[in-house]
Amino acid sequence: ANGAFTVKPGLGRVPAWNPSQNSERGILAQSMSVQGLLTRDPSDLDLAMPILSKNDPVDPFHVPLPYDMGSRNSKCKVALARETPGFETHPEIYKGLELAADALRDAGHEVVEVDPPLILETAMAGYRALMGEVIELLGPDIRKFGSSEINRIFDEYFKQFKPYTGTDLLKILAKRSYYAREWSIFLTKY
């Protein structure tokens, strides 16, 4: 609701690789890495995304699909989610959501207010797993190279999202498919 337009496509749609990295990223960092653009208008997105998503063999997970996968003229059902468990939402955010919902309705789309599946459980499991990966793979570098403020921030992350470790980390990584499945089913409806 700020006048900018963006697309953050799913994993593999835009190739990603950081040539300055000293070691490979953890599995969660790899699977959450999505690249996209922030543009002035949708036509800028349409101009740039086909270039951004061209094949690059340095990303072994890139899927070279065309950016435009079909007609945008079909009407769809759109989920409007207001739930932000554990966080207070500013009234201006709700106003922006209503403006967006009204614009979608005016364009002929069906807007349905829903609660996304398992949002708090998914978020907590994801953050705790990520913190488990971070503390093992990046923890020494955070402590060595991070400022006191960065270290304080990560200490707070580790406190709020107690890192999964050992077998618990492996089990929650396996459970990612359960959460992904629930969201996949949800996203086929909206």
Where are the model-predicted features located?
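Short low-complexity, flexible loop/linker segments enriched in glycine and/or proline
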Residues: N2-F5, E121, A125-M131
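Charge-dense, low-complexity intrinsically disordered segments
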Residues: M32, G36-T39, F87-P91, E121, ...
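A short helix-breaking turn/cap at a secondary-structure junction
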Residues: F5-A100, L118
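Alpha-helix boundary/capping residues
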Residues: L11, Q21, I51-N55, F145, ...
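Acyltransferase
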Residues: T89-P116, L138-S148, L169-Y190
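Short helix-loop capping/hinge segments that flank enzyme active sites or metal/cofactor-binding pockets
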Residues: R72-A81, R128-S184
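Short connector loops at secondary-structure junctions
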Residues: H109-G126, F158-K159
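Short coil/turn connectors at secondary-structure junctions
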Residues: N2, S74-K75, K189-Y190
